[in-house]
Amino acid sequence: MRVDEFIPDSMKSILTKNTSNTNVINENQTSGDANGTNSVDFGNILNEKLQEVNDKQIDADNTTNAFIQGDDVDVHKVMLSTEEAKLSLELAVQMRNKLVDAYQELNRTQL
């Protein structure tokens, strides 16, 4: 199972847009703010973490397929990679739920 199959097209365009500005963001990260603090782009971090979740899902799928085909893969490795992918996906879903809740709370606030 691939995680990026479940990302809506609107989110894909946002994530793609954020990665197109990497040169500007990298310059900001190395130079820092005027106050001397380093700025970090939330979109890039989110994109990297979603890519890591996707990679874990793909690795678990490949390990499972190799085991099914009879390759020299230990059952423990299959179970560990599958559980790691499952837990990382559950964490990503919970983070998404919290972000949606925070967004909805911001929309409910009156100015």
Curated annotation (Swiss-Prot):
Pfam families: FliE. GO terms for cellular component: bacterial-type flagellum basal body. One of its GO terms (biological process) is bacterial-type flagellum-dependent cell motility. Transmembrane segments: none annotated. Keywords: Bacterial flagellum. One of its GO terms (molecular function) is cytoskeletal motor activity. InterPro entries: FliE. It is found in: Bacterial flagellum basal body. Belongs to the FliE family. NCBIfam families: fliE. HAMAP family: FliE (MF_00724). This is Flagellar hook-basal body complex protein FliE. It comes from Clostridium acetobutylicum (strain ATCC 824 / DSM 792 / JCM 1419 / IAM 19013 / LMG 5710 / NBRC 13948 / NRRL B-527 / VKM B-1787 / 2291 / W). The lineage of its organism: Bacteria, Bacillati, Bacillota, Clostridia, Eubacteriales. The gene is fliE.
